A protein has these predicted regions:
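OB-fold and OB-like single-stranded nucleic-acid-recognition modules
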Residues: 2-14, 21-213
Length: 213
């Protein structure tokens, strides 16, 4: 099956894996000094955000089970993906709904709270077709990296296993770096990646981001 990009944030390939060593709500994440040398990434998990967050993705309801997919969606009919449980969802509050059999779906920008296991809505969903996402800052300043492509490929191959339990979504090499999309990061995973691979070799991007004040 082909894969469809489903958000303006350009989240690519993969699926969520939410279990294992995710930090419990309100707990302090372990520090990089607590992790084995070279194994910070995947040993550490960011604490859930205390404030509201925003994410863009596809909401899918299969027989009453509602999830939001912040990564890619298989271009089948109806679409398929593995996502994050979504609480407080009501289709009556949503525009742009499609359905096929017992499956309903739509693409939305969502505001809510994330507790490490589910997203709970705190605002009305906005269809992505009507949503103007804020520009994201490029942490590299547009400067290419210098890591050889062969090393980037090895790093990319490691990331799904290293980050699976901390919300890995996707990764790809570009401009001398590996770009990796995760469900949520407050800087913990970026610091861990810098510890393991060198500063700026791996760029971590969070699908959920703090809501505007």
């Amino acid at each position: 099956m082909r894969v469809l990009r489903i958000s303006a944030a350009a989240l690519l390939g993969g699926m969520l894996a939410l279990a294992g060593c995710a930090a419990s709500p309100g707990s302090a994440p372990p520090s990089s000094s607590d992790a084995p040398a070279g194994q910070s990434l995947g040993s550490l998990a960011p604490a859930p955000p205390e404030a509201e967050v925003v994410g863009e993705g596809t909401v899918i309801d299969v027989d009453g089970t509602v999830e939001v997919c912040l990564g890619p969606v298989a271009e089948s009919y109806p679409p398929q993906c593995s996502g994050l449980p979504l609480r407080g969802w009501a289709w009556d509050d949503a525009d742009g709904v499609e359905s096929s059999g017992s499956v309903r779906w739509g693409q939305y920008a969502l505001t809510g709270t994330y507790d490490g296991s589910a997203l709970t809505l705190t605002g009305a969903p906005v269809p992505l077709a009507l949503y103007d996402p804020p520009a994201r800052t490029d942490p590299t300043g547009g400067e290419p990296g210098s890591t050889p492509e062969s090393e980037l490929t090895v790093i990319q191959d490691e990331l799904p296993d290293r980050l699976g339990s901390t919300g890995y979504l996707a990764s790809y090499p570009e401009d001398g770096r590996v770009w990796v999309d995760v469900l949520w990061d407050d800087g913990t995973l970026q610091r861990a990646a810098d510890d393991d691979y060198g500063v700026g070799v791996v760029i971590v991007r969070s699908a959920l981001r703090p809501a505007a004040p």
